Amino acid sequence: MKLTCVMIVAVLFLTAWTVVTAEPHSSNVLENLYLKAHHEMENPEASKLNTRDRCQRANFVCDAFHHAAVCCEGVCVLVCAW
């Protein structure tokens, strides 16, 4: 019984904490994401999702520290491998 009460109080506290610390203008955040996506549709060069032209071919030396070195095909295991 006591454990149940403690759990209920903890859940209520965490719910209240989430509501209090939530971002007050969350609709603006979604609007900004929409505007950014719309801009990227108009200007494909601005899109960060278009990384196909920056990928590395097979046998290219890659490591976990160079995030720009993405293998076009396969995975990075010290070198781009199939």
From Swiss-Prot:
* Cleaved propeptide residues: 23-53
Which domain of life, per UniProt? Answer: Eukaryota
Keyword flag Metal-binding: no
Q: Which residues cross the membrane?
A: none
Report the InterPro entries cross-referenced here: Conotoxin (IPR004214)
**Keywords (A to Z) from UniProt:** Disulfide bond, Knottin, Neurotoxin, Secreted, Signal, Toxin
Q: Give all cystine bridges in this chain.
A: C55-C72, C62-C76, C71-C80
Q: Where in the cell is it found?
A: Secreted
Q: GO molecular function of the protein, one example?
A: ion channel inhibitor activity
The signal peptide stretch is: 1-22
Q: Name one GO cellular component term.
A: extracellular region
The keyword Disulfide bond belongs to this UniProt entry's keyword annotation: yes
Q: In which tissues is it expressed?
A: Expressed by the venom duct.
Main location, first listed in the record:
secreted
Domain free text: The presence of a 'disulfide through disulfide knot' structurally defines this protein as a knottin.
Q: Which family does it belong to?
A: Belongs to the conotoxin O1 superfamily.
Name of protein: Conotoxin C11GB
Which organism is this entry from?
Answer: Conus vexillum (Flag cone)
Upper taxonomic lineage: Eukaryota, Metazoa, Spiralia, Lophotrochozoa, Mollusca
